[in-house]
Structure formats: structure tokens, C-alpha cells
Amino acid sequence: MKIQRYDLPKIIKNDFLLYGKIHLTLLIAIILSASLVIITVYNTRLLITEEEDVIQKKKKKMMNGEI
């Protein structure tokens, strides 16, 4: 008797395409949303750091009597 082999990645891909379109769409949406949150937080932290640098420069100028 010959052992029958199945191509598991192909079966999983076909199942996703036939039965899991909504799940696949939601998975992509979740990954995209998480990526956008990370990018937004990163950019916000950069802006906060930049703002703190500007405030420190203003304080130094005030302490030196330049303003």
C-alpha cells in the first residue's frame, strides 16, 4: 500500500482562500493597524524630544540674558 502525502501549505492556502477571506482580511487589517500605531508613536516621541530641545535652548538663552 502506497503512503499518500498531502501538500500541507497548499491545503492551508486553499482553505484560507476558500473559507477564510474575512479572517485573512481581518488579519491584514490588524497588522496594518498595529504598524500604523507604532509609526505614530515613534513620530510623536521624536516631536516631543525636538520640543524639549527647543525649550532647553530657550531656557539657556534666558539664563544668559540673550532674550
Swiss-Prot record:
InterPro entries assigned: Cell_div_FtsL (IPR011922)
Sorted UniProt keywords: Cell cycle, Cell division, Cell membrane, Membrane, Transmembrane, Transmembrane helix
Topology Cytoplasmic: residue spans: 1-21
Name of the protein in question: Cell division protein FtsL
Gene of this entry: ftsL
Source organism: Buchnera aphidicola subsp. Acyrthosiphon pisum (strain APS)
CC per GO annotation: plasma membrane
Assigned protein family: Belongs to the FtsL family.
The protein's role, per its UniProt record: Essential cell division protein.
Topology term for the membrane: Single-pass type II membrane protein
Major site of localization recorded for this protein: membrane
Listed transmembrane segments: 22-42
Subcellular localization: Cell membrane
Positions on the Extracellular side per record topology: 43-67
Pfam families registered for this protein in UniProt: FtsL
GO BP terms in the entry: cell division
Lineage: Bacteria, Pseudomonadati, Pseudomonadota, Gammaproteobacteria, Enterobacterales
